[in-house]
Each structure stands twice: as structure tokens, then as C-alpha cells.
A protein has these predicted regions:
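Conserved AMP-binding/adenylation subdomain of ANL enzymes
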Residues: 291-309, 317-358, 373-376
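Gly/Ser/Thr-rich phosphate-binding loop
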Residues: 247, 357-362, 371-438, 451
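Conserved ATP/PPi-binding loop(s) of AMP-dependent carboxylate-activating enzymes
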Residues: 445-449, 460-494, 533, 630-631
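AMP-binding/adenylate-forming catalytic core of the ANL superfamily
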Residues: 169-194, 209, 353, 360, ...
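N-lobe entry segment of adenylate-forming
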Residues: 1-115, 122, 126, 208, ...
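Conserved AMP-binding/adenylate-forming core of the ANL superfamily
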Residues: 80, 98-157, 174-179, 242-248, ...
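Conserved pre-ATP/AMP-binding loop-to-beta segment of ANL
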Residues: 96, 223-226, 237-272, 279, ...
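Structural core segment of the AMP-binding/adenylate-forming
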Residues: 157, 161-248, 363-364
Length: 657
């Protein structure tokens, strides 16, 4: 958090007032802030009343044993009932829940399905019955490793219906990453598909599941497989004693399923994220508070109306796909688009035009990609249905904000730049579209009912015009309850820096207006295309290669992905110079160990790494090199000449095309 960065941010003077029509009919008005401040618990109790409960709560919040929160104590609820059944019961069974758009199968023709709420209720009930027949009981964990097809939402809701916490693993992660997550949460059933489509080509998923399951001993009892691509699973690709086709057991199951109401604090899902230790961190979210937080913020931040068509482009393997594709929108009975593919030129704008999307929620990485392609592409489509735009995953720079507003939003759509985390479960900082004037690059203000602050090293509020650490002072409904199986690590990771404060790991600044600017991670977790990856985990993957002795990884600024992985490696003496293909070899190795998203953009083979006398690697100096800056203060290094050696190698560094 340099002084230069902080001072630059305060110069943004452009403002965009809420459209008058939107402001007049906004779901949430200015008075919500004062109402929430006067009685936070009453505010969230009112938000919880938007849901259907089996039994009402005796106590809104139990914070008697911090940092372990309990929300809506004594209440019972079922997430699937709130996302599906209650909308059918209210007479909205014919309303489309999902406009699903698959990858184009051939030029100009896409695989599409419309799933109504009545359809979804039947599918979820059938899947719940099928899982019960496979021995899944309340409390059992189920791993899900699937492409972006309707069945992944069905699988999640079927698990929620049964009270079986799901752990969804991003389909781009490796077999090793999947195995570690299956093992950590002790999942006995894995739901997957034969494959998915990416950029028009079939991509296999089942082989990675087979490899992962083989690493977990006899832990996994069944693998339930959706036929998506119809591709040949190959010799040994089907275990008749373990593997079950979805269409064999789900399609034939009964559509009648009596749901059980679960305790408000019953585990809903475990979401794994790369933590600073390099080992997967299982974030536990429970049911009542999480549903309250996600459904309310989806309704408030996106100003959702009955006739809106909403589209969140996130993959369901990430938390945004949980909170703002599955539980938030479906909890609110929204109609939404779900897309299997990647953002090819013009494809997204075609979908917005075809389905008359009115609310669009995507990441700055995608926006910057479209900027590079040129405005003539979106200009060729009718985007007049859009009325609100959202941004998620990382701070959006002012230039991208303006382009997004002008080119995609036609200079009429408010932008909600949202800040939240896997851990927070729900959006915590965002403009309210009918209340807040938008300021390019700023996430603006904490939402009603949340207590955000920016503090210095002594946990004192820094005040307007200053930067510091982003913290949360009071509990919120969708907050993580703990780390799966490790309460102590939960306390150490999030609550140990300052007593009573949740430290988000992000730096932030309050500008002269008191608006919040996010400055990115202050620890060693990188933000690549809106996805959090641990430098430690990537370093571990590099060092596991037989030619590598030591590695250091930094996140360097990248105009497209926000940050890019840059690695510095010392080879083993036996490896010599590693050979001409060493860089590509190491990239492929990281992709195999973790996933393609973690593949370094740049790898530099160096003779030594900059270390302090205590042996700590000075990553900030490596970041200077990766970002082509003048190297900073080297006085604390054990050998300051090391940086001259590394700088000497800079011209020979190999970067990804």
C-alpha cells in the first residue's frame, strides 16, 4: 500500500447518480442504513422474514462465544424448500428458473434448456431420492465436480434438501486438488459428469475423478455420473461396483420427496479456498444465516424485480456461483441465465440480446478482455434490456468501470462494484443502486447491517483520506462459522491479529468522502482473474518437480487478469540449466498439480533468492522485478548482490505467450 497508490485514488471526481426511475422504485432506500445502525439484530431478523422457516428462532444472534456465531437460534429451515418448493406453492411453478445455454455444438447452434421452478422441484426431489437410495444421510458430505450444466444446481439443492453438506470443486482443478478436498471433508459420494464443453470441444472430467478417488483409498462409495458429452470413457473408465449413471437412478426416481427442516446452524456446504498455509482451507457455511444474507443482498444490491432476467457469469465451483447463482437468486425466485462456456467474442452479448438480460454480474477480468477486443463487438448487439451492471472478484479499475458503463450499459445502467469473500458468504460492501452515486473504482460503502472499518496497526480507525487494513467489527448472518475440522486455525487465521475484529486480509483506503477503495491482498494470497490462489501452494507444486530445489512466487499486476503468477526457481545442481524446455515443463507441472488457472505467466530460473538473515524470502523485491520496477531497499538482505544476479537474468526470463 504505497503512498503513491493512496494519493492517486483520492483524485477520482466522476460521479454517476442513480437513475431517477430506479431510485423511485428501489427495493432498499436510504433509511435502511439508519434503521440497521439503530438495531442490527432487528434489521437482520426482518431480512430473515423474507424466507420460509419451519420453526421461528428464539434468539436472532448468539455471540456469547466469539468468534463462533450462531444466527437464528432454535429455528429450523430447508434451503431447497426456500429455493424451489415455496415458489411453486406460491403459484410460480411455470416461471423459468434457469435459461441454460450450452456451448455451441456447431456453428450458430447452441444446446439450450429452459428449466421452470416446477421442473426444478421435480428434478431436485428425484435427485434427493436417488442420493438417499445410494445411502446418503443427513450430515454426510457429498463432493461435486461438474461443468456448468443444470444438474450441478440440482445436485447442490438435492444435498441441501437432505441436509448433506456439499463441497463443490471447480472443474478446472486437478485430480490431486480434488482428492485433497474429498479426503479433508470425508465425502463418500462424488457427483460428476463424463465431461463438459469448453471452446466448442468436449473436455473429459470423469478420468480426473477416477484418479482422485484412487488416491483416497476406500473412502468413496459411489460416483454418480451425468452424461453430458457422451464421450468414450476408455478402458477402465467405468467401475461397475462404484459408478452409477445419473439417468439410470435420478430420471427413474420418484418426484415426491418430503423435505426435513434442519437446524438454522446445520452445515450447508464446505467451500475450499487456498489459504496462506498452502493447504486447502475448508470454509464452513451453515443454512439459516447464509440464506438470509445471500437472498437479502441479492434482492437489495441488484434491486431485483419479478420480471428481471439476471445473469451471473461465475462458475458454480467458486463462491460467487454458490451465493449469487444458486442460493441468492433461487431463494428470491429469480429467472436467470446459466452459461456453460467461456466468454468468446460476441457470445455473451448475443445471450444478453436473445434472453433480454436486465441484470448482468461479471468480473473485471472479463471486462478488461472485452475492452482489448474493442467496442465494435458489443456495439453490434442490442443490449438495451440491461438496467443494472455488477462487478465481482477484485477491484475494478476506473478505466474498466467507465468502459463497462458506457459500452455495455449505454451510459444508463448503475454499476454495483461488490466486495465480499468466500469467507463472508454475502456481499458486504457495495453501492445501493437506488441510493448511492457511483464512483469509478470505489466499492463505496458497507451495506446496511454490516460494520466495516479501515484500521491501522493498532486497530484504530484511520479516518477519511487514509489507508490501512479492512476489518469487520460485528458478526453478519452469512459469515463462515469455522474452518472444517479446525476451530483453532479458524481463530488464528481470521481473528488473531486484533481481538474482536475479523481481518479480511485486504488493504483499503477511505477517500475524502469516506468511500471505501479496496487495495488488494496484504498477505500472500494472489487474486488471479478474481480467484484466490496461494503463493505457498504454487511454490509447493514447483518444488515437487524433480528438477527444482527452491521456488518463490509473487502476484504481478496484469492488465487482463488483475494479477498474474510469476515464479522464480532455483534448479537442483543435477538438473544443470534444466534444458531448453524447462519453463514449459514447469508450467505443465503446476497445471497438473493444482489446475491450469495456477500456471505461471512467467518463470525465471535464478541462481539464488533474496533472503533476510533469518532466511525469509523478500517477495516484495521479486515483485519489483516481475513488475519491471526499480528494486526497493535491499539493506535487510543477507547478500544484497543476489538482486543484481536476478536482474541480470531478467532479459532471459521466459513468459507465456
Amino acid at each position: 500500500m504505497s503512498d503513491q497508490t493512496l494519493s492517486n485514488l483520492s483524485r477520482e471526481e466522476r460521479r454517476f447518480e442513480p437513475p431517477a426511475e430506479l431510485a423511485a422504485h428501489a427495493n432498499v432506500k436510504e433509511e435502511a442504513y439508519a434503521r440497521a445502525d439503530s438495531d442490527r439484530e432487528a434489521f437482520w431478523a426482518e431480512a430473515a422474514e423474507r424466507l420460509d422457516w419451519g420453526q421461528k428462532w428464539d434468539q436472532v444472534l448468539d455471540w456469547s462465544n466469539p468468534p463462533f456465531a450462531k444466527w437464528f437460534v432454535g429455528a429450523t429451515i430447508n434451503a431447497a424448500v426456500n429455493c424451489v418448493d415455496r415458489h411453486v406453492a406460491a403459484g410460480n411453478g411455470d416461471k423459468v428458473a434457469l435459461h441454460w445455454v450450452g456451448e455451441p455444438l456447431h456453428e450458430g447452434v447452441a444446446d439450450t434448456r429452459d428449466v421452470t421452478y416446477a421442473d426444478l422441484k421435480d428434478l431436485v426431489s428425484k435427485a434427493a431420492n436417488a442420493l438417499t437410495d445410494l445411502g446418503v444421510k443427513k450430515g454426510d458430505r457429498v463432493a461435486i465436480y461438474m461443468p456448468m450444466i443444470p444438474e450441478v444446481v440440482v445436485a447442490m439443492l438435492a444435498c441441501a434438501r437432505l441436509g448433506a453438506p456439499h463441497t463443490v470443486v471447480f472443474g478446472g482443478f486437478s485430480a490431486d486438488a480434488l482428492a485433497s478436498r474429498i479426503t479433508d471433508c470425508e465425502a463418500h459420494v462424488v457427483i460428476t459428469s463424463d465431461g463438459g464443453y469448453r471452446r466448442g470441444a468436449a473436455s473429459a472430467l470423469k478420468p480426473a475423478v477416477d484418479e482422485a478417488v484412487a488416491k483416497t483409498g476406500d473412502l468413496v462409495r459411489n460416483v454418480l455420473v451425468v452424461r453430458r458429452t457422451g464421450q468414450d470413457l476408455g478402458e477402465g473408465g467405468w467401475n461397475a461396483e462404484r459408478d452409477v449413471w445419473w439417468h439410470d437412478v435420478v430420471d427413474s426416481a420418484s418426484a415426491d420427496h418430503e423435505p426435513e427442516m434442519h437446524d438454522s446452524e446445520h452445515p450447508l456446504y464446505v467451500m475450499y479456498t487456498s489459504g496462506t498455509t498452502g493447504t486447502p482451507t475448508g470454509i464452513l457455511h451453515t443454512t439459516g444465516g447464509y440464506l438470509t444474507g445471500t437472498s437479502y443482498t441479492h434482492w437489495a444490491v441488484f434491486d431485483l424485480k419479478d420480471d428481471d432476467v439476471y445473469w451471473c457469469t461465475a462458475d458454480v465451483g467458486w463462491v460467487t456461483g454458490h451465493s449469487y447463482l444458486t442460493y441468492g437468486p433461487l431463494g428470491n425466485g429469480a429467472t436467470q441465465v446459466m452459461y456453460e462456456g467461456t466468454p468468446e467474442r460476441g457470445r455473451w452479448w448475443q445471450i444478453i440480446q436473445d434472453y433480454k438480460v436486465s441484470i448482468f454480474y461479471t468480473a473485471p477480468t472479463a471486462i478488461r478482455t472485452f475492452m482489448k477486443q474493442g467496442r465494435e463487438i458489443p456495439d453490434g448487439y442490442d443490449l438495451s434490456s440491461l438496467r443494472l451492471l455488477g462487478s465481482v472478484g477484485e477491484p475494478i479499475n476506473p478505466e474498466a468501470y467507465i468502459w463497462y458503463r458506457e459500452v455495455i450499459g449505454g451510459e444508463r445502467c448503475p454499476i454495483v462494484d461488490t466486495w465480499w469473500q468466500t469467507e463472508t458468504g454475502q456481499i458486504l460492501i457495495s453501492p445501493l443502486p437506488g441510493v448511492t452515486a457511483g464512483k469509478p473504482g470505489s466499492a463505496m460503502k458497507a451495506l446496511p447491517g454490516t460494520a466495516i472499518d479501515v484500521v491501522n496497526d493498532e486497530a484504530q480507525s484511520v479516518g477519511e483520506g487514509n489507508g490501512g487494513y479492512l476489518v469487520i467489527r460485528e458478526p453478519w448472518p452469512a459469515m463462515l462459522r469455522t474452518l472444517w475440522g479446525d476451530d483453532q486455525r479458524f481463530k488464528d487465521t481470521y481473528w488473531s491479529r486484533w481481538e474482536g475484529l475479523y481481518f479480511a486480509g485486504d488493504g483499503a483506503k477511505l477517500d475524502e468522502d469516506g468511500d471505501i477503495w479496496l487495495l488488494g491482498r496484504v498477505d500472500d494470497v494472489m487474486n488471479i482473474s478474481g480467484h484466490r490462489l496461494s503463493t505457498t501452494e504454487i511454490e509447493s507444486a514447483l518444488v515437487s518437480h524433480p528438477k527444482v530445489a527452491e521456488a518463490a512466487v509473487v502476484g504481478a499486476a496484469d492488465e487482463t487478469t488483475g494479477q498474474a503468477v510469476c515464479a522464480f526457481v532455483i534448479l537442483r545442481e543435477s538438473a544443470g540449466d534444466g534444458g531448453p524446455d524447462i519453463v514449459e515443463e514447469l508450467r505443465k507441472h503446476v497445471a497438473h498439480e493444482i489446475g491450469a488457472i495456477a500456471k505461471p505467466r512467467q518463470i525465471m530460473v535464478v541462481p539464488e533468492l533474496p533472503k533476510t538473515r533469518s532466511g525469509k524470502i523478500m517477495r516484495r523485491l521479486l515483485k519489483d522485478v516481475a513488475e519491471h520496477r526499480e528494486v526497493g531497499d535491499v539493506t535487510t538482505l543477507a547478500d544484497s548482490a543476489v538482486m543484481d544476479l536476478i536482474k541480470g537474468k531478467e532479459g532471459a526470463a521466459s513468459a507465456e505467450d
